[in-house]
């Protein structure tokens, strides 16, 4: 009888240990499925870039954006094939692309955004005022300028400079454009520049890369002034790096090295697209920086 009891106790103990181990394996599997991975899953042979299919000057599915060109540069340096995973850059973009392991890097990602882990920044720019040459507004360099009080100024609703406009009493005559759109069908930047060319607004405020790109395409070209002299409201200049998954530490370090080693080539690509680049002292970075060796 005692022997039988001992055997049963031993069996119960073994079952308990097996259940504990199985529970740990299940928990580990569930953790992995939720994205909390302990290993990096970066494709070793293909540079898989998360991108928007219609969001120039950043990217499009024809490979015409500067993030497309940066992808080509990095793929060449990494000696990898290049593949773009396209998804509209709106709510859910990071979750459905990088978070779903369908790609391994977002080429443009603001510092301080906690949806992904950022690399070192590779450019710095600011929101900018866009106006016609000779309009009397092409020398305005701050939203505190009294000349804007009576002007109709375009602004993308919900962006930081909207706060600066409100502080300076410019919202009465403002024309708002939507922030959250499906980029496959609409572009607030294109609509704003179109209204500026037609005279429906006197000036517009856009994120630097968009301002520079569309101003350069206009006929005649429009004047772009980075807004770096604001003393009221939020700052309007930001650093942009690349976004990777939080677990991909080695991948982040590899991208950081590539950014450092190829900064002049990166600057040249950005300048070719009209991006108003700024150094840390808010001074413009010109084409001469793109000719210097790293």
Indicate residue ranges for each PLM-predicted region.
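Ligand-binding clefts/hinges and TM-proximal coupling segments of bilobed small-molecule sensing domains
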Residues: 30-32, 160-181, 256-294
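Extracytoplasmic small-molecule ligand-binding "clamshell" domains
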Residues: 31-114, 183-186, 272-273
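Extended ligand-binding regions for polar small-molecule ligands
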Residues: 31-32, 65-77, 134-137, 141-160, ...
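Periplasmic-binding protein-like
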Residues: 52-53, 124-136, 216-259, 273-294
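Alpha-to-beta junction loops
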Residues: 79-81, 99-108, 150-152, 192, ...
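Twin-arginine (Tat) signal peptide motif
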Residues: 2-11
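Bilobed "Venus flytrap"/periplasmic-binding protein-like clamshell domains
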Residues: 53-57, 61-76, 129-188, 209-210
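Acidic, polar ligand-binding/catalytic clefts
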Residues: 72, 76, 81-147, 158, ...
């Amino acid at each position: 009888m005692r022997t039988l009891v001992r055997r049963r106790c031993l069996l119960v103990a073994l079952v308990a240990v097996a259940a504990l181990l199985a529970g740990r394996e299940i928990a580990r599997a569930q953790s992995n499925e939720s994205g909390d991975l302990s290993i990096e899953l970066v494709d070793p042979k293909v540079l898989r870039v998360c991108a928007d299919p219609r969001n120039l000057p950043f990217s499009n599915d024809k490979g015409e954006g500067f993030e497309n060109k940066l992808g080509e540069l990095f793929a060449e340096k990494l000696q990898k094939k290049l593949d773009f995973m396209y998804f509209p850059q709106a709510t859910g973009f990071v979750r459905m692309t990088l978070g779903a392991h369908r790609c391994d890097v977002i080429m443009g990602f603001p510092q301080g955004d906690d949806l992904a882990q950022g690399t070192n920044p590779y450019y710095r720019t600011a929101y900018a005022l866009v106006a016609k040459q000779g309009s009397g507004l092409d020398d305005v360099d701050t939203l505190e300028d009294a000349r804007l009080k009576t002007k109709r100024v375009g602004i993308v609703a919900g962006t930081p400079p909207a706060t600066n406009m409100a502080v300076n009493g410019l919202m009465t005559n403002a024309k708002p454009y939507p922030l959250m759109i499906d980029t496959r069908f609409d572009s607030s930047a294109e609509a704003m520049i179109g209204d500026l060319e037609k005279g429906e607004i006197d000036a517009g405020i856009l994120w630097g890369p968009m301002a520079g790109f569309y101003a350069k395409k206009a006929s005649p070209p429009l004047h772009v002034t980075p807004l770096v002299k604001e003393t009221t409201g939020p700052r309007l200049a930001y650093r942009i790096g690349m976004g990777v998954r939080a677990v991909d530490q080695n991948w982040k370090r590899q991208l950081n090295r590539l950014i450092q080693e190829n900064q002049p080539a990166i600057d040249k690509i950005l300048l070719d697209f009209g991006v108003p680049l700024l150094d840390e002292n808010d001074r413009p970075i010109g084409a001469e920086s793109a000719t210097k060796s790293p």
